């Protein structure tokens, strides 16, 4: 199987946008011409039931899995071929919106002693930070807009308003999470080092506190991600050298120091006597952004109907089986266009995991076709409202705080 991609190649797949596990290209200039990437995984078309098929896909033969892959490949290439000026205008429009909201919010908070200015400034800054992280940072760092060859909107140059340095986040998210999606013991986004999130994880007494752990994590989510990505538990296990972790902690501190200075020193100083009011507004905006992103992200892979997988499934996994795993390991959120924008289009989590390097504004366009493919192959297309899905997430976190807890069957398409 051959995939054509227009994003620049990199010597480190961990920082590449898009389908990093499929990329095996040599180093190239930052804005290289399109390269052809060969899928190194073996194809297993035999007409028999795949030995590694997850429960909701157990009825599919290898031939059907490869046919499904061909349809999804064709859909991806259709979108790639149609990218153009309208997409470029979209991302420039969102950047202008985000920067306008931030400028307006910061400006209003100069007068933060006035309650109305405080409320307006805090609200504008909260939305600006959400857009920065969700629709801009996350998606640009995936390489979704690299095809424009714009050095200012590129996965190799973009930095975001987030505690986690862009390069560190790309390694842990673009590579580890999108390669090993919902594979127990490999996908760190499953949170297995922090909470018990599957019944297969051994229960320990400290799990009783995980509802409180989850609450605390939601309040400091950006910092939790940043520290989590350093994998300090591996240092304790002796599988990661302290020297490496120490260097990563220094990089993290440099970024965190800038973030703290910006929000809690520099901009509050502009308010003069309103210093503390502005600092409180910035703290509120950061906290609300953290709570929102935590809810959206947890709803992408934790609700009922989403499957997790054994690591053995990765052995000889074909492109088609990778697609199936992404679909069964992800869940969508339903809502309005404004809601989708505020989630960074991660409300289309299934489409994002199938095609992480396609422009985010295209996910809503292709979602009906992806759903139709799922229905035709009798695969679940898990979706629901944010309150409904987040309620299921919280219920699961509480349930797994106690011993036991068997897996729930795959949900029917919502």
Regions of interest found by a model, annotated:
Residues 116, 290, 294, 301-307, ...:
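Flexible loop/turn segments at secondary-structure boundaries
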Residues 88-133, 208-223, 247-295:
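Alpha-helical bilayer-embedded segments of polytopic membrane proteins, i.e.
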Residues 127-247, 314-404:
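Membrane-embedded catalytic scaffold of the fatty acid hydroxylase/desaturase
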Residues 19-47:
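Long, low-complexity intrinsically disordered regions
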Residues 268-269, 280-318, 398, 403:
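Extended hydrophobic/aromatic segments used for targeting, binding, or gating
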Residues 377, 405-414:
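Acidic, carboxylate-rich catalytic segments that either coordinate divalent cations
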Residues 1-25:
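N-terminal acidic, proline/glycine-rich, low-complexity intrinsically disordered segments
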Residues 42-104:
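Low-complexity, highly charged intrinsically disordered N-terminal segments
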């Amino acid at each position: 199987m051959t995939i054509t991609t227009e994003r620049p190649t990199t010597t480190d797949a961990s920082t590449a946008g898009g389908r990093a596990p499929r990329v095996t290209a040599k180093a190239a200039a930052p804005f290289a011409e399109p390269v052809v990437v060969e899928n190194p995984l073996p194809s297993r078309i035999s007409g028999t039931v795949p030995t590694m098929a997850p429960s909701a896909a157990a009825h599919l033969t290898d031939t059907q899995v490869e046919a499904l892959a061909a349809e999804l490949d064709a859909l991806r290439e259709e979108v790639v071929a149609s990218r153009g000026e309208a997409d470029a205008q979209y991302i420039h429009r969102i950047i202008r919106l985000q920067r306008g909201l931030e400028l307006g919010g910061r400006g209003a908070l100069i007068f933060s002693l006035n309650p109305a200015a405080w409320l307006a400034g805090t609200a504008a800054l909260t939305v600006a930070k959400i857009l920065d992280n969700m629709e801009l940072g996350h998606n640009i760092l995936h390489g979704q807009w690299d095809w424009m060859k714009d050095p200012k909107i590129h996965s190799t140059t973009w930095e975001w308003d987030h505690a986690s340095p862009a390069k560190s986040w790309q390694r842990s998210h673009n590579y580890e999470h999108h390669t090993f999606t919902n594979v127990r013991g490999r996908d760190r986004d499953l949170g297995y080092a922090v909470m018990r999130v599957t019944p297969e994880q051994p229960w320990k007494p400290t799990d009783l506190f995980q509802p409180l752990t989850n609450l605390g994590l939601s309040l400091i989510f950006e910092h939790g991600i940043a520290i989590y990505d350093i994998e300090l538990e591996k240092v304790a296990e002796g599988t990661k050298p302290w020297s490496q972790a120490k260097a990563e902690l220094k990089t993290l501190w440099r970024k965190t120091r800038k973030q703290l200075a910006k929000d809690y020193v520099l901009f509050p100083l502009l308010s003069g006597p309103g210093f503390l009011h502005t600092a409180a507004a910035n703290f509120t905006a950061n906290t609300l952004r953290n709570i929102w992103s935590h809810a959206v992200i947890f709803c992408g892979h934790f609700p009922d109907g989403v499957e997790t997988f054994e690591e053995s499934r990765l052995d000889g996994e074909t492109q088609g089986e990778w697609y199936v795993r992404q679909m069964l390991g992800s869940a969508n959120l339903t809502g309005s266009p404004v809601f989708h924008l505020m989630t960074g289009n991660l409300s289309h989590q299934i489409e994002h995991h199938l095609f992480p390097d396609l422009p985010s504004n295209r996910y809503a366009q292709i979602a009906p076709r992806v759903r139709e493919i799922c229905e035709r192959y009798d695969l679940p297309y898990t979706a629901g409202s944010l309150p409904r899905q987040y309620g299921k997430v919280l219920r699961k976190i509480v349930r797994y705080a106690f011993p036991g807890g068997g897996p729930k069957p795959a949900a029917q398409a919502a």
